[in-house]
Structures are given as structure tokens and as C-alpha cells.
Amino acid sequence: LIWVHDYHFLLIAKELRKLKCTQKIGFFLHIPWPSKEILTALPDHRELVDALLDFDLIGFQTRKHVLIFLDYIISELGGSVEPDGSIFALGKKSKVKHFPISIDTNKIIKISEETDNSTQVKRLVKSIKTDKLIVGVDRLDYSKGLELRFSAYNHLLTNHSEHIRSTTLLQIAPTSRGSVFQYKEIRRKLELSAGKINSAYGDFDWTPIRYLNKGFQQKSLMGFFRNSRIGLVTPLRDGMNLVAKEYIASQRVSDPGVLILSRFAGAAEEFPDALIVNPHDPEGV
């Protein structure tokens, strides 16, 4: 059995079949599968999917991604689909299912409970002078929608002044691909945005945005989640998003925080009771 992960190796089954490889080969896509309209904009979209069909099993994060893929198979390739997920197209047979990745929930609960005695978490709680701590934890990546997130928080302070001094946004965003120019630009823009918001609304004893371009240990992050009132998870696109799951698992059962979740994260399919928002709509966020 060969198990292949993510789009970087999407063509590998086709190459292995050329080498007479007869083992079962499975493929799991961690990112969202594009809509038919976007996929067909690629000149070689048929060749791409043809290579994908050389896998015996194709896995996606959500049922929605499976349905989008099957729509392409039927409408563009004239393929057929069986009730068990088997597909027939381009003279090949494969099978498609969704396998949402997750977390070790019991482990996260245990870790978060232990943070009640964490010195670092106590320091955070002591330093927060507001009623509502909002926490965001993301890689510094364009897909996470951090610029729009800061814009939404600025919109909140501008149009709902009662939240000035009553909220604090703690955004943790460790560097991702720091040597790439585009990622350096994201960091520069975020630092500029945070500076403008803090300059406009901050005071000597209150900083609206605490933006930290560094990582923290998992135990510390779970403690930050546990002591916040809002978890802000607003990616522009995300296959699943495990931060959303960690946020929920880390909460106190007696007094949980609220998860604000992008409709474009795969996790939204599993958490309909979260506050589902469009990250492009600052008023909605």
C-alpha cells in the first residue's frame, strides 16, 4: 500500500503505473478542491484529473469537496458515480471519499486543563485589562486572511465604539516561508496595519492589537484559547483548519468562549453552531 499526501505529488500515481507498479495507491488532498469553473480555466485540467484517477482511492477533507469533484467527473468527463463512491471516467476506475482530519481531543482537553497553573498563561490573563480577549493563531500565510481580520477589528472599533477598551485582539502569526518576498510583504502589511490601529485607538494603558510574529508551545496556545472569550478563525480558504477544533476542545465546559469561523474553512461543515462568517465582510465578522 502506498499513501500519498497533498497536491505536490498529484501526478505520482501515473508515473508509478508507468513503472508497472501494481500496489494499491491512495491519495489525500489537504487543501480545498477547486470548483469546476476554476479548474476548467487550466488548459490541462483533463490531464490533471486523468493522472489523479490513477490512484485507487482519492480522499478529500469534506463532503463538499467530494461533491465538487464528482460534479466535474460527471459534467466534464462524462463519467459515472456509484453509491459507494466508485467513479468511472476516462477508462479508469477509482473511489472517492471524504476523511476530515482532526485532533486528539482528549489530549487537548488534558493539556488545556493543566494550563490553569501555567505561569505564562497567568501572565497573559493578568496583563489583559479588558473584558473580552479575542485570540487568533495562524501561520503567516496569505490564505489565512490576516489583513482582512485586522480590517474587521478596525471596523469594529470604528463603528461600535462601545468595544473600545473592552476588547483586545491577540494575534499570533509565526513566520511561514520567510525568505519568499510575498510573505515578507504580508508581514510588513500586518505590522503596518496593527501599528495604525494601535495608534488610532490605543492609549497608555490599552493596546487594541497584540500582534506577535513568533510561535508558542502548544500548551501555551491552549491556555490562551481557554482564557479567551472569542476564537477568531477566518481563513480565505482552508481545507479543514485544526485551530478551530483545538479552540473548541480547550474551552471550559462551564463557561466556553465563542468560535467565529470562516465559511470557507472546511471545519465550517463540522461546526454549524459556530458563528459562521464571510471574511470579506468586515461588518459580518
Could you describe each region identified by the protein language model?
Residues 1-285:
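Catalytic cores of carbohydrate-active enzymes across secretory and cytosolic contexts
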